[in-house]
Amino acid sequence: MNPEQFQTALAEKGIELSDTQLKQFHDYFEMLVEWNEKMNLTAITDEKEVYLKHFYDSISAAFYVDFTKFDTICDVGAGAGFPSLPIKICFPHLKVSIVDSLKKRMTFLDALAEKLGLTDVHFYHDRAEIFGQNKAHREKYDLVTARAVARMSVLSELCMPLVKKGGSFLVMKAAQAEQELQTAEKAIKLFGGKVEEHFAFSLPVEESERNIYVITKTKETPNKYPRKPGTPNKLPIE
């Protein structure tokens, strides 16, 4: 998917990009490739692949969820900024917080935000388990996103504590998501969530499977969650 195809594909979904936004994506791609030579940000560096598997894939959530109704977003373990920064470029009103445990990624994200002229973006170098117990952030976000490889039960413990009551947790998964969801149902309920919607679709060009789950927070997460760093991964609630 080249930049022109990317622009057309988004327009077909009702997302019209301005010249400024197109340049932001171009600069994002260039910086990602440039910085990737000195630090491991992504295995995907071909332009068409980046536009499809990073940019388009990140924004695909907006085909099913109305981002205009959200104000604050927290992205847990965003790595090189996915999915939250492509979404932010498309919806500039959003106030985005990214938490990641790797300091070098923070350095990249700081430089990227400055280069792209992004405002209302904040980057936090922290473990998600510690961040989720921080009163300044706990149960403060309209939407929390995760596009991570961790199991859904683990992601729920890391992300649900950050979602405000009435807010949403948006999980982006590739294949075999239904099986993961079944295993995670106990955890989702324990942390105050209820699975509201599931959208299954294929990424264009390569036709790979994608799943988006919207989990609504119906009650507060018990204070003891998330547990200490490493525990959710070692002893997932399933």
UniProtKB/Swiss-Prot annotation:
UniProt entry tagged with the keyword rRNA processing: yes
Primary site of residence: cytoplasm
InterPro entries: rRNA_ssu_MeTfrase_G (IPR003682), SAM-dependent_MTases_sf (IPR029063)
UniProt xrefs under SUPFAM superfamilies: S-adenosyl-L-methionine-dependent methyltransferases (SSF53335)
A Pfam family annotated for this UniProt entry: GidB
GO CC annotation terms, alphabetical: cytosol
GO MF term list: rRNA (guanine-N7-)-methyltransferase activity
Binding site for S-adenosyl-L-methionine: G77, F82, A128, E129, R147
Role summary: Specifically methylates the N7 position of guanine in position 535 of 16S rRNA.
Sequence similarity: Belongs to the methyltransferase superfamily. RNA methyltransferase RsmG family.
Protein name: Ribosomal RNA small subunit methyltransferase G
Originating organism: Listeria monocytogenes serotype 4a (strain HCC23)
Name of the gene this protein is made from: rsmG
